[in-house]
Structures are given as structure tokens and as C-alpha cells.
């Protein structure tokens, strides 16, 4: 499984952490299951969690699947204005915040991603993060057995 550094909007972090946001939506994304270090931008500028993301799914396919349900199809269409894919958030593990500025001082080649970067291409950075992260003990694993129309394109 590949590892990425994923930029994430602070406003969505609480619902992700609570397990309410079970899909991540992006315009571009890799086509495989990944482990992601979650980076929150300004003002925090910290890596705060590790999450597992499932293989991408086309929102276009969801639109086909739910075309007979107007409310759901409208939500999907709205999300499609900004995104192309949805990925299941498989699990979430909170870590003690890691200041990105300190990481960049150690590894000046590390740039803050607009969306995401593959950390596998920066093995020294990945090793440092893996060796220096400290889990807080808070973690969740999302259950997708009862996912349905009410969970599609809501957060």
C-alpha cells in the first residue's frame, strides 16, 4: 500500500475524526487504496492523523446508480461540479500533531501539497514520519455495511 501526504481542510476535520465523514471527494486521486498522513494547513500547519482511503470510485457511476432518486442524484451532481472521485475513509488514527515547518527544516525538498504527494517518492521523509509519529490512542474504523442513499455526497 502506498503512502501519501494529503492536504485537508480544517473545517472537515472534526466530522472526519468523529466518523461522520466516511467518503473523501477529490477532483484527482490515485487509483489504489492508500495510507495517508493528513495535513491541516494554516493556521495549524500540522500533520494530525493517518487515514486509510479505499480505491477511488467515479461519482459519475454513483449518478447512474441513483438516477431514479432525485434528491440523491442532485447531491451527486452538485459534488460533481467540484470533484470527480469518492474514496471510502476506511480508518482514522489520530497522532500527536507534527509541525510541518519542522519537517521541512529537516527535509527542505518537502513541499506542501495542494492536494496530495506520494511519500513513497521521498523515502527519507516517510521513514522519519513513520519513526516519529505518536498515536494518541484515538482511532476509528468505518463500517460500510449499512451505507446507503443518506450517506452519499453529504459531507
Where do the protein language model's features map onto the residues?
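Short acidic, glycine-rich loop/turn motifs
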Residues: 40-42
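Binuclear metal-dependent hydrolase catalytic cores
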Residues: 51
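Contiguous surface segments at macromolecular interaction interfaces
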Residues: 1-29, 45-48, 56-155
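Short coil-to-beta transition motif at edge beta-strands of beta-rich domains
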Residues: 28-38
Amino acid at each position: 500500500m502506498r503512502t501519501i501526504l494529503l492536504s485537508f481542510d480544517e473545517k472537515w476535520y472534526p466530522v472526519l475524526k468523529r466518523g461522520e465523514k466516511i467518503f473523501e471527494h477529490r477532483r484527482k486521486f490515485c487509483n489504489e487504496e492508500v495510507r495517508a498522513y493528513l495535513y491541516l494547513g494554516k493556521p495549524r500547519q500540522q500533520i494530525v492523523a493517518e487515514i486509510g482511503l479505499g480505491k477511488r470510485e467515479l461519482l459519475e457511476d454513483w449518478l447512474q446508480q441513483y438516477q431514479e432518486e432525485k434528491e440523491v442524484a442532485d447531491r451527486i451532481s452538485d459534488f460533481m461540479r467540484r470533484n470527480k472521485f469518492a474514496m471510502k475513509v476506511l480508518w482514522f488514527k489520530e497522532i500527536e500533531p507534527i509541525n510541518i515547518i519542522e519537517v521541512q527544516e529537516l527535509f527542505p525538498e518537502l513541499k506542501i501539497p495542494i492536494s496530495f504527494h506520494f511519500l513513497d517518492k521521498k523515502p527519507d521523509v516517510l521513514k522519519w514520519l513513520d519513526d516519529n509519529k505518536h498515536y494518541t490512542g484515538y482511532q476509528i474504523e468505518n463500517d460500510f455495511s449499512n451505507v446507503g442513499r443518506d450517506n452519499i455526497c453529504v459531507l
